[in-house]
A protein has these predicted regions:
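A conserved short coil-to-beta-strand element within the FAD-binding core of flavoproteins
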Residues: 98-112
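Helical element adjacent to the flavin cofactor pocket in flavoenzyme catalytic cores
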Residues: 79-96, 102, 160
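Short beta-strand "acidic-cap" motif of Rossmann-like dinucleotide-binding folds
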Residues: 29-35, 43, 128
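Short hydrophobic core segments
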Residues: 9-11, 120-134
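Glycine-rich dinucleotide-binding loop and its adjacent helix/turn
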Residues: 77, 130-162
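Core beta-strand elements of the Rossmann-like FAD/NAD(P) dinucleotide-binding domain
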Residues: 4-6, 116-125, 162
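Glycine-rich active-site loop/strand segments that organize a redox cofactor
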Residues: 30, 41-83
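N-terminal Rossmann-like FAD-binding beta1-loop-alpha1 element of flavoenzymes
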Residues: 4-33
Length: 162
């Protein structure tokens, strides 16, 4: 038996999870967003120093919320993107719990149950909005060379690491 029940559970508090929360609220659908870190955590902890967003500012937007910029054709840095996502969260006011990690998701008769470190939540439906690249993928060939230095983009910060 789950400790809590919601209609829809959204896993992930980045731009996709916040957008889903916004759309669910607009439709009057009860939901809860769970984020393992802070809002926009992967932008904070899994990006390298000096990263510039790969799309021009004019193309950056979230539903009902434009990206404020001084140069439409420019590219924003990570701090500006984090601030934008935080501002969007303030605009959306999602029912969110940060610092909560889903350790397992399983089906049950009523939908799904998400296991957490401190309990469980049942939901009729679940949206997984964790992004496509949570786990580094390294070629198995590299296992044969344990002394070979490797760094994945998710943990790279700057040239001093190399």
């Amino acid at each position: 038996m789950a400790d809590e029940t919601v209609d829809t559970l959204v896993i992930g508090g980045g731009q996709a999870g916040l957008t889903m929360s916004h759309r669910l609220k607009q439709r009057g659908i009860g939901h809860l967003v769970l984020e393992r870190g802070r809002i926009a955590e992967r932008w904070r902890s899994e990006r390298w120093d000096g990263l510039m967003f790969q799309f021009p500012n004019w193309s950056v937007r979230l539903p009902d919320f434009a990206f404020p910029h001084a140069d439409a054709d420019g590219f924003s840095d990570t701090a500006a993107i984090i601030a934008f996502i935080e501002d969007y969260a303030t605009f959306v006011t999602p029912p969110i719990r940060c610092g909560v990690e889903v350790t397992k998701l399983r089906r049950d008769a009523g939908g799904f149950v998400a296991d957490l470190a401190g309990g469980s939540i049942a939901a009729r439906s679940v949206v997984v909005a964790t992004g496509p690249y949570q786990r580094p993928l390294r070629p198995a060939l590299l296992d044969d060379h344990p002394g070979l230095f490797q760094v994945h983009a998710s943990s790279y910060k700057n040239p001093a690491q190399l």
